[in-house]
Amino acid sequence: MTEKSAPTRTVTGRALAVLDTFDAKHRRQSLASIARRAELPLTTVHRLVHELENQNALVRGSDGDYEIGSKIWRLGLLASVHSELREVALPYMEDVYQLHNDAMQIAVLDGLRCLIVERIAGSRTLEVISKPGSRLALHATGVGKVLLAHGDAELQKAVLNSLDRYTDQTITDPGVLETQLKTIKVQGFAKTQEELAEGAVSIAVPLRGKGGNVIAALGIVAPSDGRDLGKLVPVMQVTGAALSRKLVEAGLGDAARLQASN
């Protein structure tokens, strides 16, 4: 794409477009990859990336590829809703982790993806791509499916129109996923079986704030080692309900809506 053919954007808009190209599948990128995904000319991206690197928003590796810098993550932690959510949720996450020793995580909606805002993991847990700051696919994760199931029609339509495959188990049929989302909303939990990463299964439940709004999802991620993960559903549902009550007491979720955004 040339400067002339690039969509008209402000400098801030172009910088944000560059940062938005980074996600769980694109943690490290070349300039060419960033330019392609941001739909910006390479010369423009080169200038923007250089400035972002100077501000510690991006970090350049020895191989020349770039990744998100610590400044972006630190700024994200200052978002009041994420900070309060993490503070209230951590004791509940730790309780379940101590009992089962599997990774616990909390996610919120971030555009057409879910953002992992907190995760607890130990030596036995899987080394998968869900870490604090990760932006993961809504249709391939337990926490993502919960958020998607409770999202508005615009969000669901946008996601259903673009179902990337991550493993052989990833659901890429819009009709199948739409039916599953309806079931998730009714039954109150989501389960995944190696849909984002091979060897990983998950269960997730909604977290509600004031007014009954679903403002986040609580998930447990475990190795697919033959255990009946279904036995954890009641534990997760009870924990989710107790945590939701605390979130209401904390005043979170007053006007939260799960909707699509640019």
Task: Label the model's feature ranges.
Residues 1-82, 86, 244-249:
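N-terminal helix-turn-helix
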Residues 48, 88-99, 183, 187, ...:
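Amphipathic alpha-helical regulatory segments at dimerization interfaces
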Residues 71-99, 125-128:
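Conserved segment of winged-helix/HTH DNA-binding domains
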Residues 106-111, 119-120:
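Short hydrophobic alpha-helical segments used for membrane anchoring or interfacial signaling
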Residues 125-196, 262:
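Short, solvent-exposed recognition segments
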Residues 174-175, 180, 187, 198-199, ...:
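Juxtadomain coupling helices with adjacent low-complexity linkers
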Residues 201-205:
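Short hydrophobic beta-strand micro-motif common in sensory/regulatory domains
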Residues 207-209:
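Sensor-regulatory modules in signal-transduction proteins
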